[in-house]
Amino acid sequence: MILFGSTGSIGVNALKLAALKNIRISALACGDNIALLNEQIARFKPKFVAIKDSKNKHLVKHNRVFIGQEGLEQILTECQDKLLLNAIVGFAGLKSTLKAKELGKNIALANKESLVVAGSFLKGAKFLPVDSEHAALKFLLEGKKNIAKLYITASGGAFYKYKIKDLNQVSLKDALKHPNWNMGAKITIDSATMANKLFEIIEAYHLYDFKEIDALIEPRSLVHAMCEFKNGASTAYFSKADMKLAISDAIFEKQDTPILEAIDFSKIPALKFHPISTKKYPIFKLKNTFLKEPNLGVIINAANEVGVYNFLENKSGFLDITKCIFKALDHFGVPKISSIEEVFEYDFKTREYLRS
């Protein structure tokens, strides 16, 4: 297996699972966490290693260290392994997804942004979903026909119990306290704004070629997806909130190993589902427009990344993330995109506009 994003929460969990099944790790790539990368190199002995910045190359305890996006593409070309787990965060993961598709590799995709910004250019790719909701949908949809609607669930994020009027006072520390999941900083903020769920709906559309998709808040994160059929029946996928299950579904050939403790249905409290309030989560107003106009993805994602990283660096407030997205959409409208090069151009233009 090739693992990009090895020091993030998905990567760390994937390596625990790889050790469980003695999966060979041929390549590791990370951003700046060189100390953890060196531990992973010592444990898994990959042939190839990549890091984000050449200034850290001398710190890496390996004799084949590649640098940046070009380095990732070189590894994909040179490494014969058929499986890439792409757990790079954000738009930075797109080039690796495109290259892996070109090379015919199986792509265990944790980098949902690849599909959000360039789904129409990734048709025919061999995807294995790593998001818990999409792994759940895959299970529910297998061999099924006559589907009326799909649902994925959201926890509501760090501010689910907050009043709307209190959201302009929240701190970064507050925003990083996810009630159910242990995740990286960016996706935790995306969960708090509901950008993550908006992106997951578009990801589901591209993965399963189905537009009747919605999301509901299920605060306990025990139900991950539901499938409604034309005859009125529905099915649901239950599991405890732990990413290892979805990762194992993607990287294991057989699903015969106990990964999580099963839910004891006699002990869980009553489950409740709630519609997502667009007053509290205004980003979710974009759902129907986004499904009609998937080209909006590159604008929404770039603006979201600018807004989130400004917030993470204490340059702006929590509510400014959403304002950033609507400002970019007002300026650019629906982009006409006919080539993958234009996706990169619009990403660049959006970031430049918001930083000017």
Curated annotation (Swiss-Prot):
Chain residues that bind Mn(2+): D131, E133, E200
First-level EC class: oxidoreductase
Gene3D superfamilies, alphabetized: 1.10.1740.10, NAD(P)-binding Rossmann-like Domain
Pfam families xrefs: DXP_redisom_C, DXP_reductoisom, DXPR_C
Pathway: Isoprenoid biosynthesis; isopentenyl diphosphate biosynthesis via DXP pathway; isopentenyl diphosphate from 1-deoxy-D-xylulose 5-phosphate: step 1/6
GO molecular function: 1-deoxy-D-xylulose-5-phosphate reductoisomerase activity; manganese ion binding; NADPH binding
Residues that hold 1-deoxy-D-xylulose 5-phosphate according to the record: K112, S132, E133, S155, H178, S191, N196, K197, E200
Cofactor: Mg(2+); Mn(2+)
Keywords: Isoprene biosynthesis, Manganese, Metal-binding, NADP, Oxidoreductase
Domain of life: Bacteria
Positions of NADPH binding: T7, G8, S9, I10, G31, N33, N111, E113, G184
Catalytic activity from the UniProt record: 2-C-methyl-D-erythritol 4-phosphate + NADP(+) = 1-deoxy-D-xylulose 5-phosphate + NADPH + H(+)
EC number: 1.1.1.267
GO biological process, one term: isopentenyl diphosphate biosynthetic process, methylerythritol 4-phosphate pathway involved in terpenoid biosynthetic process
Family assignment from sequence similarity: Belongs to the DXR family.
Function: Catalyzes the NADPH-dependent rearrangement and reduction of 1-deoxy-D-xylulose-5-phosphate (DXP) to 2-C-methyl-D-erythritol 4-phosphate (MEP).
The protein's name: 1-deoxy-D-xylulose 5-phosphate reductoisomerase
Name of the gene encoding the protein in the UniProt record: dxr
